[in-house]
Amino acid sequence: MSASRVTLPALFAGLGTLAAGVAALAVARPGSIAVEPVAAIPHATPQEFPTVSYDGTFTFVRVRFNAGRRSFGGFGRARNPGWAHDYPYADENFIKILDEVTLLGPNTEGTNVIDAGDPELHSYPIAYVSEPGGWAPTQAELDNIAAYLGKGGFLILDDFRSNREWANVEAIFNVVLPGHSFRILELEEPIFNSFFQIETLDLPPPTFPQYRPIFLGLHEDNDPEGRLMVIANFNNDIGDYWEYSDMGYYPIDLSNEAYKFGVNYVIYAMNR
């Protein structure tokens, strides 16, 4: 893996409040749709995906999933498939920040890409899913993700927007966790205070500013007081902030906020 290009002093020079809010559309809560798993297709691999061996050290894991005919494609520099959007820079930059500001001692030598249907995923407590709006799960993926969450795993869903993509995500998790419903998360939720004190949930999306960002979660036993198993950064893309945080595309304070959300997710999940 290439070395991180994040300039830590610049990124954390001003861990302050967000800039003023952004014009946005109201979010509608679409009804569920039936998931129709499709046959697995060969993974699109425009680049190498080196991995690191499991040794018990916290390692950033990205989920590679079956996109089938529903793939929306990424907007990253290499136009990776949706599940690889912002890879590898977002992953590398985030893990360097996590190492810098916490005592977790994460693996800074590399990150992993693991198939959604691979039981190896169970070795890692937290996994990141990019563009789940284009996920067309196989039965093996549905079963493995259900087992992963049931055993204590935590999923971060990022980089998706629109009612169409939300309907796909909601339908997938209606199958993975029947009887569970996503609920809108408020600022007072423990996950937003697990390490950094998040001051606002109005983190403007780096792209598609016409959408209003919203955070939603799935809780164990569908109990709002229970363990949060899945968090969805709906109508947002914190991975994009991570990827371009050293290139001047976005204001430093917004990149800082995106990192704070990610760090909080990890610390929350590692302590529940």
Predicted regions and their residues:
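Bacterial N-terminal signal peptides that target proteins for export
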Residues: 1-17
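Hydrophobic alpha-helical membrane-insertion segments, chiefly the h-region
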Residues: 16-28
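Aromatic-Pro/Gly-enriched surface loop or interdomain linker
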Residues: 27-126, 132-133, 237-272
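An acidic, glycine-rich "communication" segment
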Residues: 41-42, 72-74, 162-244, 258-259, ...
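Short alpha-beta junction capping motif
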Residues: 60, 126-166
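Active-site-proximal beta-strand/loop segments in catalytic clefts of secreted hydrolases
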Residues: 63-66, 129-132, 151, 158-160, ...
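Extracytoplasmic/secreted envelope proteins and their assembly/folding machinery
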Residues: 91-95, 142, 146, 166-170, ...
